[in-house]
């Protein structure tokens, strides 16, 4: 009799949901206080003037104004500031 051995099971075949990280408001954009600027893991971007940081390192606007990206310091870190209007 012709028989076929049963195929083995696999541990693959699933993926995690995307976390929708990244910059949400770009340089030159007008924002309101409370708007989320960046969702990130760790501090790829640092909080500058009028910008707050959440417990998951999310950066948000503390004041209404215009978004400005800048690199400063000896390590040329990226800072996001809000220039108040």
Curated annotation (Swiss-Prot):
GO terms for cellular component: cytosolic large ribosomal subunit. Residues 1-22 are annotated as: Disordered. Pfam families: Ribosomal_L27. SUPFAM superfamilies: Ribosomal L27 protein-like. One of its GO terms (molecular function) is structural constituent of ribosome. This is Large ribosomal subunit protein bL27. Keywords: Ribonucleoprotein, Ribosomal protein. Belongs to the bacterial ribosomal protein bL27 family. GO terms for biological process: translation. It comes from Psychromonas ingrahamii (strain DSM 17664 / CCUG 51855 / 37). It comes from the Bacteria.
